[in-house]
Amino acid sequence: MAKKKDSNALAQNRKASFDYAIEDTIEAGMVLTGTEIKSVRQSKINIADAYVRFDGGEATLHNCHISPFEQGNRFNHDPLRVRKLLLHKKQINQLIGASGRDGYTIIPLKVYIKNGFAKCLLGVGKGKKKYDKREDLKKKDAKRDVDRAMRDRQKY
């Protein structure tokens, strides 16, 4: 059975759950220009390679690609510009502490619209080793086999 798509997610970072063990999530607002928010509403955003950095006590989103707005004019935005994330000071300090630990990083998990504002769900993740990824795949296959057996058993 296919997974249900998250109805309000405009962009998801599916590779994040495979490459990182996500331990904590925080919602952050995004500072966008007019043409950027129009492109985001059309789901023309890619956060697969994006990451969060902290510059001068501010959280910024790097390597997030938002396609130029098709009906935009010559004042259209730069697709890969650095975007500021809106967080409380306490949350920023919490994320700085988490990213300072060895092997941890802050990555965007999904982008969505909430009450008319663009939001980004950030995850604190620890990078997985190759054997961790293989182990997760084995667990996933075993769970699928058990679910299939239970489903077949209920038919009769």
Curated annotation (Swiss-Prot):
Region annotated Disordered, chain positions: 127-156
One Pfam short name: SmpB
Record's function text: Required for rescue of stalled ribosomes mediated by trans-translation. Binds to transfer-messenger RNA (tmRNA), required for stable association of tmRNA with ribosomes. tmRNA and SmpB together mimic tRNA shape, replacing the anticodon stem-loop with SmpB. tmRNA is encoded by the ssrA gene; the 2 termini fold to resemble tRNA(Ala) and it encodes a 'tag peptide', a short internal open reading frame. During trans-translation Ala-aminoacylated tmRNA acts like a tRNA, entering the A-site of stalled ribosomes, displacing the stalled mRNA.
The protein's name: SsrA-binding protein
Gene name of the encoded protein: smpB
Assigned keywords, A-Z: Cytoplasm, RNA-binding
Gene Ontology MF term list: RNA binding
UniProt subcellular location: Cytoplasm
Similarity comment: family membership: Belongs to the SmpB family.
Signal sequence segment: none
Residue spans of biased composition, Basic and acidic residues class: 132-156
GO biological process: trans-translation
